[in-house]
C-alpha cells in the first residue's frame, strides 16, 4: 500500500476508491474495502482509500476529543493488511470541510484520477453531509465518476460500526468488541515507573503509559490480556482503575501483572491485547483480602490464556 499525503501529488493510475475515517478498521470496514478491490479487479483498475489523519470533527469542533479505536499510526498499520494499492491520507482542513460533495468528488477525479467511488451504504460526505447517494450519482454523471453503493455488512442482526464497538469497550465487553473488530482490542504504550506496591504484595506490575492520548481506554476493571514486549507474547492480568484498596487518589492507572515473568521491562514498548473481562475493580477491607482475590484472578487468567 502506497501512502499519499500530499494533495498536490501527481495523479494515480485510474482507480476505484472509497471514503471514510476507518477508525479501528473493523470487519465492516474490511467488507467495504473488499468490495472496492472486487470492483477494481473486475474493471482492471487500482484500488484506493481516501481517509484522514485526524478525526474530521476535531477540525470542525476544536474542543472535540475523539475516543479512537486506533491511533493514526495503528490505523495505517491495519489498513496495510487490507492490501489496497493506495491510501490517500488527506489533511482534513477547514477549507476541505467546506467543500460540497460535488466539489470533493471533482477534486478526487481531477487531482487523483478516481474513476469509480464505492460508497458505504449509509455513508455521507461533503459540507454538512446533507446530500444523498442519488445526488452523488447525479454528480458522478457530470464528472465522469461511476458510483457504486456498497452492500451493508452485519453480524447476524447486529450492525457493526465504530460507535457500537466504542460502547462495548466502555462497558468492558472486550470479547464482543473483538468479534466486531476481527481482532482483540489493544493499547500500545511504554512501561513507566509506578509506586511498586504490587511487588511488595507478590504481584509485580508493569504500568502502561498509552502512546495516543485520544485512544479509548476500556471500562475500569480486571481483564485477562496478552502482553507483547520485544516480539514476545505473555499472558497477564490487567487492572484499569484507581486501586481503591491501596490508593485514595483519582488518577486512573493501567497495570498488568505478567504471568511467569520476571524481566526488567521499564521504559520498553508494550502492547496490551484485551481477551476477557474478569470482574469490576473493588475495594477490599484489608490488603490480605486483596491478595486472596488476586490469586483467584491469576488462576482464572491462567485457565483462559495458558
Language-model regions, residue ranges each:
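Extreme N-terminal starter segment of soluble prokaryotic enzymes
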Residues: 1-3, 14-15
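Glycine-rich, Lys/Arg-enriched anion-binding loops that position phosphate/diphosphate groups
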Residues: 140-239
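N-terminal catalytic cores of NTP/NDP-binding nucleotidyl/phosphoryl-transfer enzymes
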Residues: 8-71
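N-terminal Rossmann-like or analogous alpha/beta NTP/dinucleotide-binding catalytic cores
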Residues: 58-121, 125-143
Amino acid at each position: 500500500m502506497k501512502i499519499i499525503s500530499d494533495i498536490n501529488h501527481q495523479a494515480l493510475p485510474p482507480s476505484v476508491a472509497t471514503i471514510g475515517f476507518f477508525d479501528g478498521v473493523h470487519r465492516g470496514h474490511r467488507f467495504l474495502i473488499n468490495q472496492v478491490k472486487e470492483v477494481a479487479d473486475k474493471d482492471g483498475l487500482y484500488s484506493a482509500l481516501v481517509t484522514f489523519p485526524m478525526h474530521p470533527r476535531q477540525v470542525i469542533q476544536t474542543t472535540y476529543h475523539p475516543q479512537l479505536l486506533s491511533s493514526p499510526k495503528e490505523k495505517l498499520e491495519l489498513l496495510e493488511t487490507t492490501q489496497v494499492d493506495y491510501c490517500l491520507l488527506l489533511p482534513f482542513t477547514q477549507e476541505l470541510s467546506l467543500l460540497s460533495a460535488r466539489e470533493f468528488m471533482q477534486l478526487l477525479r481531477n487531482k487523483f484520477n478516481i474513476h469509480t467511488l464505492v460508497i458505504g451504504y449509509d455513508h455521507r460526505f461533503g459540507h454538512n453531509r446533507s446530500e444523498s447517494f442519488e445526488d452523488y450519482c447525479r454528480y458522478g454523471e457530470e464528472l465522469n465518476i461511476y458510483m457504486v453503493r456498497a452492500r451493508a455488512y452485519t453480524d447476524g442482526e447486529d450492525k457493526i460500526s465504530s460507535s457500537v464497538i466504542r460502547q462495548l469497550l466502555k462497558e468492558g465487553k472486550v470479547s464482543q468488541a473483538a468479534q466486531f473488530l476481527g481482532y482483540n482490542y489493544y493499547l500500545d504504550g511504554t512501561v513507566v515507573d509506578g509506586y511498586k506496591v504490587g511487588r511488595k504484595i507478590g504481584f509485580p506490575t508493569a504500568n502502561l503509559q498509552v502512546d495516543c492520548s485520544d485512544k479509548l481506554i476500556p471500562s475500569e476493571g480486571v481483564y485477562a490480556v496478552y502482553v507483547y514486549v520485544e516480539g514476545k507474547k505473555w499472558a497477564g492480568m490487567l487492572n484499569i482503575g484507581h486501586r481503591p484498596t491501596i490508593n485514595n487518589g483519582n488518577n486512573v492507572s493501567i497495570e498488568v501483572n505478567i504471568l511467569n515473568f520476571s524481566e526488567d521491562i521499564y521504559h520498553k514498548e508494550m502492547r496490551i491485547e484485551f481477551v476477557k473481562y474478569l470482574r469490576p475493580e473493588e475495594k477490599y477491607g484489608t490488603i490480605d483480602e486483596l491478595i486472596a482475590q488476586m490469586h483467584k484472578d491469576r488462576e482464572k487468567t491462567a485457565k483462559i490464556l495458558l
